[in-house]
Amino acid sequence: MKEFFLGIIQGLTEFLPVSSSGHLALFSKIISFPSDLALFAFFHIATFFAVFILLFNDIWNILYGLVRSDKNMWNLALKIIISSIPAGIVGLFFESKVEAAFSSQKLIGVFFLVTAAALWLSDKYSGNKTLNDITYLDALIVGLFQAIAVLPGISRSGFTLIGALLIGMTRVDAFKYSFLLSLPITLAAGLLELKNVDLTTATLSGFAGAFISGLVALILVRFVTISAHLKYFSIYLLIPAIVSFFMK
């Protein structure tokens, strides 16, 4: 039952710009469930499939374009790879430091506030760049925002959306790029930890919960991104931030 509950939390908070890692660390402590990074990473595979379904047409266009040697699609695929590199480097070389951050609930509270402040400002920015218009430097900048989000309490979706909006992307394409960018890192994280997860009925129920709630969250975040209402999530984030400061 606890695994299913945590799967629901993972699916919702993975895509809503409120930090899934921070919420999982917080709720694990509240329900006295050991912080299991392998299990949380396994749930990433479920959220991978949620993105795959919602953005299937875009993913198909990229894959079909690669087969047909479409220059725009090859460039876009390369930009996604470039954006994925910074977070990959942080994950490989600073894993122990990131894991240590999960043990400090007050530090997680600070990171919640950082995400809240960034989201409050994000609705002021957007531009006219489409997926095909962004440069390799733009892709690297968004990737740096994603790398920061390996810290618990910093939202990956929130920070990549902010990065995409700051480089001047349209809100629709900022949403698409943010979640296309999530595919390599979420799948890799899930597969790397799969060997450390016991595939019991409980863990599979958590997987199902993450998938279903992930789809719901994706639809919601697409709406709030396009309508420039991300700031409302910054108000919500004050709650887990305050709770984190009072947790022992």
From Swiss-Prot:
Root EC class: hydrolase
Main localization of the protein described in the UniProt heading: membrane
GO biological process: cell wall organization; peptidoglycan biosynthetic process; regulation of cell shape; response to antibiotic
Cited InterPro entries: UppP
Membrane topology, as annotated: Multi-pass membrane protein
Organism superkingdom: Bacteria
Gene Ontology molecular function: any one: undecaprenyl-diphosphatase activity
Misc: Bacitracin is thought to be involved in the inhibition of peptidoglycan synthesis by sequestering undecaprenyl diphosphate, thereby reducing the pool of lipid carrier available.
Identification of the protein by name: Undecaprenyl-diphosphatase
Natural source organism: Fervidobacterium nodosum (strain ATCC 35602 / DSM 5306 / Rt17-B1)
Lineage: Bacteria, Thermotogati, Thermotogota, Thermotogae, Thermotogales
